[in-house]
Regions:
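AAA+ P-loop NTPase catalytic core
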Residues: 3-252, 290
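Short glycine/proline-enriched turns and hinge-like loops at secondary-structure junctions
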Residues: 185, 267-269, 314
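Conserved catalytic/switch belt of AAA+ P-loop NTPases
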Residues: 228-237, 255-309
Length: 314
């Protein structure tokens, strides 16, 4: 219930607070990250939001564990170990997730030098490990990679995902961001597996529906409105007009591929991107047909794009 959730959040805060002090682990991770190049331009607010999302996932993991182990919930050393180790993991992916590969490895070494928390072997980067909710300790992701037999008839099928350390790592982080209900951007060169990462992750998350749309240089807000008409449901409520997914028990993910392709207008605005920002920041949009404000509920956006340094990208 709400009381237990609040108590759990306060317990987590008590364990996290020492690392959030000035010149503490989180402060130094933030400063280090902002001083290095990312695959896309980033800000302190974006990094802090990412960390908050992963911290929320930490709390969800504890709540789910306690629901499954009501007779022996997570307490004492188990709870403390899980929180502080998950804190390091959250800092690793929130502040370092969009760094270049070489900088990410250096970031892992920097984290090791800053904390007295027992961390796994320094022979491998921290990104090859995860924190297990069952004991609160670090374990190798390699131990979680299942052995699969691939049918030769499906070897050329691009929808087939062979589990690896990389796919498992991406899935864990992606699930946390999707559960936060905040927009997500996947950025990487062509063929790096952006679409595959999302598709593979959603296989284990049945409470999401996804619709994909490919952006081009001429994409306009009208395309998003058509998506809403087809996959959403407008409902009149005492608080005004509300747009929800057609399936009331699910969240609709609008996957916008090549999201940085639309051209700027003469005022320097990418109109479809501004429209998406309005929905995300204001929680709705102005319907041009009915001249009414529409509040959106359970609709989430995920974008994929090539690095902005590529030709034709904005």
């Amino acid at each position: 219930d709400a009381k237990k959730t609040l108590e759990l959040q306060n317990e987590v805060i008590n364990d996290v607070a020492p690392f959030a002090e000035k010149h503490g682990l989180l402060d130094q991770c933030m400063a280090w990250s902002l001083a290095h190049a990312h695959i896309m331009e980033t800000t302190a607010m974006q990094l802090a939001t990412s960390f908050s999302c992963l911290l929320q996932q930490l709390i969800r993991n504890v709540m789910e564990y306690n629901m499954d182990h009501q007779e022996v919930p997570m307490t004492g050393d188990h709870f403390h170990s899980f929180v502080v180790n998950s804190l390091v993991e959250a800092a690793l992916y929130s502040f370092g997730g969009s760094l270049m590969s070489s900088d990410l490895h250096e970031f892992c070494r920097m984290i090791r030098s800053l904390t007295t928390i027992p961390l796994p072997s320094s022979e491998e980067p921290l990104t090859n490990f995860y924190v297990d909710v069952n004991d609160g300790q670090w374990h190798s992701l390699q131990t979680c990679v299942p052995k699969v037999n691939v049918d030769m008839r499906t070897i050329l099928d691009t929808s087939v995902v062979i589990p690896t350390v990389d796919t498992l790592r991406n899935q864990r982080v992606m699930e946390a961001f999707l559960n936060s209900r905040l927009p997500v951007i996947l950025c990487g060169p062509p063929g790096s597996g952006k679409t595959m990462t999302l598709s593979n992750c959603l296989k284990t998350m049945p409470h999401f529906d996804v619709v994909s749309v490919n952006f081009s240089s001429s994409t306009q807000p009208s395309l998003i409105l058509k998506i809403f008409e087809q996959y959403g449901c407008y409902q009149k409520t005492p608080n005004g007009l509300v747009l929800r997914p057609a399936s009331p028990d699910k969240t609709l993910i609008v996957f916008c591929d090549e999201v940085n392709l639309p051209e700027e207008d003469k005022y320097g605005t990418q109109r479809v991107i501004s429209f998406l920002r309005q929905i995300v920041e204001q929680g709705g949009f102005w319907n041009p047909r009915d001249h009414l404000w529409v509040q959106t509920q359970n609709i989430q956006f995920v974008g994929a794009c090539n690095p902005p340094t590529d030709p034709g990208r904005v």
